[in-house]
Design a protein with these regions (language model features):
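Cytochrome P450 core scaffold surrounding the K-helix E-X-X-R motif
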Residues: 43-49
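Extracellular beta-rich ligand/substrate-recognition surface
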Residues: 7-15, 67
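Glycine-rich beta-strand-centered segment in the early N-terminal region that forms part
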Residues: 22-40, 52-95
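Conserved hydrophobic/aromatic beta-strand scaffold that supports enzyme active sites
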Residues: 18, 23, 70-72, 106-108, ...
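Short gly/ser/thr-rich secondary-structure transition/capping motifs
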Residues: 12-18, 53-55, 97, 134-135
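NAD(P)H dinucleotide-binding glycine-rich loop of Rossmann-like/cofactor-binding domains
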Residues: 67, 82, 92-150
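Nucleotide donor/acceptor-binding cores
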Residues: 1, 87, 148-150
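Short structural boundary motif marking the start of a folded domain
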Residues: 1-4, 31
Length: 150
């Protein structure tokens, strides 16, 4: 599959390159998603630039960046409902704690990180629901019930 990736820190034009990588089949509890869109977050930019305190080199030899995205589930690992095959999903924390994020044609990740996208919501919109959407939910709901407070 085609994937953008980097092996050293720096500005995107200096370190990102198009690569041909193997798409990993899903393990137990995982799904493989054919990505339509990849969302870019400030945390992705900071990670690629090496701007996180105390981090002096990339965590993996080659990193496909980006945490968020959207696409269609194409393959299922054991233990994942067959009903999910073909499901439109949005992805959150795609590149967290692993080398392969959403700047690729496919991503394989835990099924819980591929959330069903409601009808009427485009894949393009789904690609920006991950970190921004979860951040908004935590801001609104983190202080307890919101009933009567709006």
């Amino acid at each position: 599959m085609r994937a953008m990736a980097y092996s050293r820190f720096g500005p995107a034009p200096n370190v990102l390159a198009l690569n041909t990588l193997v798409s990993t089949p899903p393990a137990d509890g995982e799904v493989r998603v054919k990505l339509a869109y990849s969302g870019v977050n400030p945390s992705d930019v900071k990670a690629r630039a090496g701007a996180r305190p105390g981090v002096v080199k990339p965590a993996f030899d080659l990193i496909t960046p980006h945490s968020d995205g959207a696409g269609i589930i194409t393959d299922l690992g054991a233990g994942v409902s067959k009903e999910r095959l073909g499901e439109r999903v949005w992805i959150w924390n795609g590149q967290w704690a692993r080398a392969h994020g959403t700047a690729a044609e496919y991503i394989t990740l835990p099924a819980t990180q591929a959330v069903a996208l409601p009808e009427g919501i485009s894949l393009q919109t789904g690609a920006v629901l991950g970190i921004p959407g979860l951040t908004a939910a935590h801001c609104v709901l983190g202080g307890g019930a919101v009933a009567g407070k709006t």
